[in-house]
């Protein structure tokens, strides 16, 4: 078993431990959160780099659905260009596996000491953990170059934080997390059955686009990063709506299009999900090959490979989607003669 495969296989157990911790009383102190900002509810700014940033999309989408202002900002861009955005009602949530990336250290040096800050971090002795008003541990275990456990753990921690900010009971989130963990276990157990046909369908594309909407954009962005890091393939994440405004012009049989389509919890979201299925059909019609991860019915069509996924609420679909993509990129790397999870240039 490769090191990356071992990391992938550990995710259900790690998330189970995380669930137990964050359902314990006082894991996220509501009174402590309230004292960090002048006005409540706050304007929540999630920031991170790479998978740490992408992990925030479900929490941001959830808070927005509750009428709470929330943004996701890349840390490097935030510290260089948007520092003056912060005000007395801003709650800054910094997500970082190490807690000591160059961008995070620069942000810590630039912020006023009175800025209310929550750290979601895997290294509890890091500079970020020491500076934050509240530390929420990722509990992802030993760090690895490719974000597997750290990504899925960050998604779950941020959702528990979002529920606490919205002052909602955590039970529905915990139920959804347990469901996602069970789905992960099934996918990993069926790896040898599910992934090889997908590898054959995927073949060797010269361009990959990953498309979705809302909270599931996390799957598109994290998936694109995994394609770059593991099998060293060029991949572009994008909003499915944005794809129709120009990028459709480069649809090509040599390209692969990955669409994440999950049933929404509101009428508006369900309409968007139907749009994702229509997009899959349109890409196929124009000659593209589509890998469709969906919990919605879709016709069995040539050049579309449907991977049914378990429906899961509370924006946690990415916990399932990402395991599918992790296994796919792992096997694509092996097929290309690469060591899965080994970096050539980045540290």
Model feature map: region roles:
Residues 229, 281-285, 330:
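Short basic/hydrophobic patches in alpha-helices and adjacent helix-turn junctions
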Residues 219-222, 235-237, 246-248, 267-276, ...:
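Extended hydrophobic-aromatic, low-complexity segments
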Residues 303, 312-347:
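Generic C-terminus detector
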Residues 27-28, 36-185, 213, 254-255, ...:
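Glycine-rich phosphate-binding loops that contact phosphosugars or nucleotide phosphates
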Residues 2, 6-45, 134-136, 141-258, ...:
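Active-site phosphate/pyrophosphate-binding segments
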């Amino acid at each position: 078993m490769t090191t990356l495969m071992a990391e992938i296989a550990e995710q259900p157990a790690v998330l189970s431990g995380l669930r137990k911790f964050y359902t314990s009383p006082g894991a996220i102190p509501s009174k402590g959160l309230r004292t960090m900002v002048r006005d409540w509810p706050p304007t929540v700014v999630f920031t991170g780099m790479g998978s740490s940033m992408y992990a925030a999309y479900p929490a941001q989408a959830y808070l927005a659905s509750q009428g709470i202002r929330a943004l996701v900002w890349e840390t490097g861009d935030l510290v260089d260009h948007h520092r003056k955005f912060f005000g007395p009602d801003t709650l800054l949530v910094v997500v970082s596996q190490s807690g000591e990336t160059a961008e995070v250290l620069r942000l810590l040096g630039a912020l006023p000491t009175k800025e209310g800050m929550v750290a979601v971090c895997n290294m509890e002795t890091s500079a970020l953990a020491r500076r934050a008003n509240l530390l929420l541990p990722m509990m992802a275990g030993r760090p690895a170059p490719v974000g597997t456990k750290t990504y899925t753990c960050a998604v779950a921690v941020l959702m528990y934080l979002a529920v606490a900010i919205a002052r909602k009971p955590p039970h529905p989130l915990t139920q959804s997390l347990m469901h996602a963990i069970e789905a992960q276990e099934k996918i990993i157990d069926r790896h040898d059955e599910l992934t090889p046909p997908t590898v054959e369908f995927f073949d060797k594309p010269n361009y990959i686009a990953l498309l979705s909407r809302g909270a599931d954009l996390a799957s598109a962005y994290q998936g694109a990063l995994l394609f770059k890091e593991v099998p060293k393939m060029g991949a572009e994440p994008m909003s499915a709506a944005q794809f129709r405004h120009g990028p459709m012009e480069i649809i090509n049989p040599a390209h692969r299009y990955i669409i994440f389509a999950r049933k929404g919890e509101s009428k508006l979201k369900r309409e968007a999900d139907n749009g994702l299925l229509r997009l899959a059909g349109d890409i196929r019609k124009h000659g593209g090959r589509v890998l469709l991860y969906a919990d919605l019915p879709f016709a069995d069509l040539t050049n579309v490979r449907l991977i049914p996924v378990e429906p899961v609420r509370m924006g946690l679909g990415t916990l399932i989607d990402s395991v599918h993509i992790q296994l796919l990129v792992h096997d694509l790397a092996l097929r290309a003669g690469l060591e899965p999870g080994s970096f050539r240039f980045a540290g």
